[in-house]
């Protein structure tokens, strides 16, 4: 039976801000800083999806995250590969994956750890306004 989480310790673009439900793939520190800085002054919900190419539960969640992002287009969804942007992952202590961190005005307000789509939707509903 598979697990709904992986641990970072298990294995050692263009920026389209989403008003239409896309997930922004964060590919560089500069891109991350640009997105993060633009969200600091906003009451808009930022959902950071911490993932890795080797994370099975992350891959399983990817289509669900895209589906959820399309439903909640008032939130911004950003995917961060923990191996590519280790400093960002470290800032948010994204050790067990997938990890979904909810941020408003530059501050973490909640998180969901693991492949738990129902819990993810519940937290988005709770924090989107």
UniProtKB/Swiss-Prot annotation:
It is found in: Cytoplasm. Its main location: cytoplasm. Disulfide bonds join 55-58. Belongs to the thioredoxin family. Plant H-type subfamily. The active site is at residues 55, 58. The keyword Metal-binding does not apply. One of its GO terms (cellular component) is cytosol. The record marks 49 as: Deprotonates C-terminal active site Cys. The keyword Lipid metabolism does not apply. Gene3D superfamilies: Glutaredoxin. InterPro entries: Thioredoxin-like_sf (IPR036249), Thioredoxin_CS (IPR017937), Thioredoxin_domain (IPR013766), Thioredoxin_H-type-like (IPR050620). The record marks 56-57 as: Contributes to redox potential value. PROSITE patterns: THIOREDOXIN_1 (PS00194), THIOREDOXIN_2 (PS51352). Probable thiol-disulfide oxidoreductase that may be involved in the redox regulation of a number of cytosolic enzymes. This is Thioredoxin H7. Keywords: Cytoplasm, Disulfide bond, Electron transport, Redox-active center, Transport. Residues 6-129 form the Thioredoxin domain.
